[in-house]
């Protein structure tokens, strides 16, 4: 007997491990064993399942639950049929292992009874024993169920919820309520703490499956309706919408459709005429016309070439200022600005940018500067190279007391020993432009100079007689002195034989001085000349001379046509004893300047006798011919 028990202990130790019935808390219920009597478990009639002893009914219930294999309540002889092929007799003959096995099963039985406490008392009574058997029957058949509540998935539950509603539509919160009320598993999981998981699963399934369609709610601030897809949709284990496989990927389907459209468009373009631009560029794969309608939507936001600003057909639509070819003659003025010995022209800013009234535009129609052509570039205007000169624009707003002269200063570099005025960028003030270092002239002066007994504007620009040109050159050749505040009188105001006399209306309260027949006005304030009634346009063929010690006096000449620019120098920058100064001490040898500075390079070759034809002039000015010819 001592050697006999040695082989069975391994069987005793292995047997519980191979028995799945000793795991009552397992999530997967075991299949029914074929050794069980089907009449005691599968029969739905109450008569066969009833046992005369209450203990036998309890044994049937526990055996149907597959929780226990042996118990103290039934005979060991009956256990033979239960054990079947196992050597149960040898196991029962071994007394020590039996109490241990029974103790293990008793503990498992107590755990099972605590789990099934509501159903065990009803199972112990003979009359109510069929009901737990019938209730436990679906559990045995639902061994392959996927969820804790049964075989129904979340999508199936949502479908039932929507179908159960009268309008066949539910909001998300209504679906939650239906789950809590209708499904027993969710009855105790309706609070916010325990419902986060399954509510998230419901939202996931609603957006995942194609059988659910979201409909916008009519009311503002309300959640959308969820309905079943009338066309039918896939549910259950259908492919997800976001799956990136080659079969159901939407991007891949679009790319295949795009390739088909591209192929069709290329074939149609080859069949059509090749003269049209669309048929030519559609053969290029990167062109917009070769893409599908989806890709072409990005091109629809651009304007076509025929309506773009870059097109030459549509005209100027860009905010860029037009060039000078579109401006009128009154807006473009060319100043004789000698950049070299042969190139004398320079373009001033348009006067429409400097003026701010309609009277200015009317005035500019008759006050245009004439541009010298190539045939007259060797005119006396080339003498302007010797010094910096100032162009004073005569346009000012008539009737505007605060308007000022617009002054633009230009200069030549490295030509004249005389102090030159540098090229300056003129800043913009409130009502006009002011050159740096210059002072404004009152607007009333220009108004009175341009009105009353002045000649008409169309007669202002008068060609200069050669005799006057020669006379002026003679005066310059005699080292004439021109004051910075002097005003050049208008020729044609009165006859002055053999000399140029001042205008009869020129009134100067200070000491006027006449040198070589030219009045020099020592004017402490230019505003005292408000009574002067004359035209400021004087035909002067000679160049302006800028005196270094007395400020700026300037005059522009353009091939015999000239305009006087009056520049006011403030009294403070002049010497206090200006009236007592001798003007003769400020000599300027123009001839030496011309000979030494202009003709030393051999490029400035001009003769005053043959420039202008003989023309009549209202003055009987007689003078000797004096000309310079480069040697």
Curated annotation (Swiss-Prot):
Residues 149-243 bind DNA. One of its GO terms (cellular component) is cytosol. Transmembrane segments: none annotated. Residues 1-57, 90-147, 223-324, 372-404 are annotated as: Disordered. Phosphorylated by AKT1; insulin-induced. IGF1 rapidly induces phosphorylation of Thr-28, Ser-245 and Ser-308. Phosphorylation of Ser-245 decreases DNA-binding activity and promotes the phosphorylation of Thr-28, and Ser-308, which leads to nuclear exclusion and loss of function. Phosphorylation of Ser-318 is independent of IGF1 and leads to reduced function. Pfam families: Forkhead, FOXO-TAD, FOXO_KIX_bdg. Residues 253-264 have a biased composition (Basic residues). It is found in: Cytoplasm; Nucleus. Keywords: Cytoplasm, DNA-binding, Nucleus, Phosphoprotein, Transcription, Transcription regulation. It comes from the Eukaryota. This is Forkhead box protein O1. It comes from Xenopus laevis (African clawed frog). The gene is foxo1.
């Amino acid at each position: 007997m001592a050697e006999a028990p040695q082989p069975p202990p391994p069987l005793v130790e292995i047997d519980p491990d191979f028995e799945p019935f000793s795991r009552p808390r397992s999530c997967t219920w075991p299949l029914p064993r074929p050794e069980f009597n089907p009449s005691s478990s599968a029969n739905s009639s109450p008569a066969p399942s009833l046992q005369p002893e209450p203990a036998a009914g309890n044994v049937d219930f526990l055996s149907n639950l597959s929780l226990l294999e042996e118990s103290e309540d039934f005979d060991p002889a009956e256990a033979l049929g239960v054990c079947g092929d196992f050597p149960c007799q040898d196991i029962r003959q071994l007394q020590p292992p039996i109490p241990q096995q029974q103790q293990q099963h008793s503990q498992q039985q107590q755990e099972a009874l605590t789990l099934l406490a509501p159903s065990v008392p009803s199972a112990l009574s003979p009359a109510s024993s069929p009901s737990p058997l019938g209730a436990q029957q679906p559990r045995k058949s639902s061994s392959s169920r996927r969820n804790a509540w049964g075989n129904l998935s979340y999508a199936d539950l949502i479908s039932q919820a929507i179908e159960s509603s009268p309008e066949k539509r539910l909001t998300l919160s209504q679906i939650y309520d239906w789950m809590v009320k209708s499904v027993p598993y969710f009855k105790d999981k309706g609070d916010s703490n325990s419902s986060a998981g399954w509510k998230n699963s419901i939202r996931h399934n609603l957006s995942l499956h194609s059988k659910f369609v979201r409909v916008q709610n009519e009311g503002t601030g309300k959640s959308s309706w969820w309905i079943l897809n009338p066309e039918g949709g896939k549910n259950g284990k259908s492919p997800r919408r976001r799956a990136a496989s080659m079969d159901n990927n939407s991007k891949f389907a679009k790319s295949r459709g795009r390739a088909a459209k591209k192929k069709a468009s290329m074939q149609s373009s080859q069949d059509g005429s090749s003269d049209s631009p669309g048929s030519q560029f559609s053969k290029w794969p990167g062109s917009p016309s070769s893409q599908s309608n989806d890709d072409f939507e990005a091109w629809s936001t651009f304007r076509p070439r025929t309506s773009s600003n870059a097109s030459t057909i549509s005209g100027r639509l860009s905010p860029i200022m037009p060039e000078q070819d579109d401006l009128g003659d009154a807006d473009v003025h060319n100043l004789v600005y000698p950049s070299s010995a042969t190139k004398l022209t320079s373009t001033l800013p348009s006067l429409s940018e400097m003026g701010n009234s309609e009277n200015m535009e009317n005035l500019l129609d008759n006050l245009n500067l004439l541009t010298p052509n190539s045939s007259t570039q060797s005119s006396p205007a080339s003498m302007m190279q010797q010094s910096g000169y100032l162009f004073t624009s005569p346009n000012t707003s008539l009737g505007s007391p605060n308007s000022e002269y617009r002054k633009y200063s230009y200069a030549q570099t490295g030509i004249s020993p005389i102090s030159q005025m540098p090229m300056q960028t003129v800043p913009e003030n409130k009502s006009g432009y002011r050159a740096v270092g210059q002072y404004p002239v009152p607007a009333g002066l220009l108004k009175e100079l341009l009105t009353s007994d002045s000649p008409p504007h169309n007669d202002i620009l008068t060609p200069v007689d050669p005799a006057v040109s020669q006379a002026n050159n003679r005066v310059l050749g005699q080292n004439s002195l021109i004051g910075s505040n002097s005003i050049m009188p208008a020729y044609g105001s009165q006859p002055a034989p053999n000399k140029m006399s001042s205008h009869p209306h020129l009134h100067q309260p200070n000491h006027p001085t006449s040198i070589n027949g030219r009045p020099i006005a020592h004017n402490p304030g230019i505003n005292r000349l408000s009574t002067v009634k004359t035209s400021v346009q004087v035909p002067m063929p000679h160049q302006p001379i800028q005196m270094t010690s007395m400020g700026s006096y300037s005059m522009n000449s353009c091939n015999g046509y000239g305009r006087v620019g009056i520049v006011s120098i403030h009294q403070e920058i002049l010497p206090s004893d200006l009236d007592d100064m001798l003007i003769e001490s400020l000599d300027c040898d123009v001839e030496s300047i011309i000979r030494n500075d202009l003709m030393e390079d051999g490029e400035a070759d001009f003769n005053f006798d043959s420039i202008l034809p003989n023309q009549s002039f209202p003055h009987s000015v007689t003078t000797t011919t004096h000309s310079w010819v480069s040697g």
